[in-house]
Amino acid sequence: MAVQAVHIQGDAFLVCVTHSLSTEREEVMGLCIGEVDTQKLVHIHSVIILRRSDKRKDRVEISPEQLSAATIEADRLADITGRPMRVVGWYHSHPHITVWPSHVDVRTQAMYQMMDVGFVGLIFSCFIEDKNTKTGRILYTCFQSVQAQKSSEYERIEVPLHVVPHNTIRKVCLESAVELPRILCQEEQDAYRRIHSLGHLDSITKIHNGSVFTKNLCGQMSAISGPLLQWLEDRLEQNRQRAQELQSEKEQLLQELKTLG
């Protein structure tokens, strides 16, 4: 196995979970940005949320254009951090189904590993209810693909995944989280324009489609934009309180220095 383990930063993990919980009916996807060290450990520092051109319940696809754009973003982060950043993996959600990758997922992963043997895949299974406690659960796994013995098919190999705690939310992950509502809105707009451009639709159907479009946007504002804004406001208030505490501590230390002098 090319990769020994994967370490994902806590704020990048938070973006993945938030993205996975944003859509219950279809799968969502994104790309992981990070680096691979000499011990074959993958370190994921940030993620890029991808826009879906085609919403499907059971699969997702990454276009070459999206992969190219992610590579450019990785180069930008490499220039900022001075570290060898690159696209090291992909993630997608499994709403209401098992966390284990499907045969399509395993084949897709094998295709990516042909370009980079260190490429990894992450899956987040969400909207799953525990039968005993009746509470929701989020399961996640990391995997790679290997060729099965005496077969042309590929099989999954689980890769240990460790979430590295992070006390703060770095700017690059904060930007990804803020980008989520805009991407979801763009997906709805694309779907509406694609349907609205059909010439054979009558007036009643167009009005109905417009109502559905408005309803979906309002649902996104209620489920995604509103909570995200509240979370950002809470973080801002926490930062302000912390700044006041540090300022008070600074003034106290300066006063003690004057006393000693």
UniProtKB/Swiss-Prot annotation:
Q: What is its EC number?
A: 3.4.19.-
Compartment annotation: Nucleus; Cytoplasm; Cytoplasm, Cytoskeleton, Spindle pole
Has keyword Cytoplasm?
Answer: yes
Binding, Zn(2+): H92, H94, D105
Cystine bridges: which residues?
Answer: none
Tell me its cofactors. Zn(2+)
Q: Name one GO cellular component term.
A: BRISC complex
Q: Which GO terms describe its molecular function?
A: cysteine-type deubiquitinase activity; metal ion binding; metal-dependent deubiquitinase activity; metallopeptidase activity; polyubiquitin modification-dependent protein binding
Q: Per UniProt, what is one Pfam family of this protein?
A: BRCC36_C
Q: State the InterPro entries in the record.
A: BRCC36_C, JAMM/MPN+_dom, JAMM_MPN+_peptidase_M67A, MPN, MPN_BRCC36
Q: Which SMART domains match?
A: JAB_MPN
Broad EC category: hydrolase
GO BP annotations, alphabetical order: cell division; DNA repair-dependent chromatin remodeling; double-strand break repair; mitotic G2 DNA damage checkpoint signaling; positive regulation of DNA repair; positive regulation of NLRP3 inflammasome complex assembly; protein K63-linked deubiquitination; proteolysis
The cofactor note from the UniProt entry for this protein is: Binds 1 zinc ion per subunit.
Describe the protein's quaternary organization and the partners it interacts with. Component of the BRCA1-A complex, at least composed of brca1, bard1, uimc1/rap80, abraxas1, brcc3/brcc36, babam2 and babam1/nba1. In the BRCA1-A complex, interacts directly with ABRAXAS1 and babam2. Component of the BRISC complex, at least composed of ABRAXAS2, brcc3/brcc36, babam2 and babam1/nba1. Within the complex, interacts directly with abraxas2. Both the BRCA1-A complex and the BRISC complex bind polyubiquitin.
The record's similarity note reads: Belongs to the peptidase M67A family. BRCC36 subfamily.
Record's protein name: Lys-63-specific deubiquitinase BRCC36
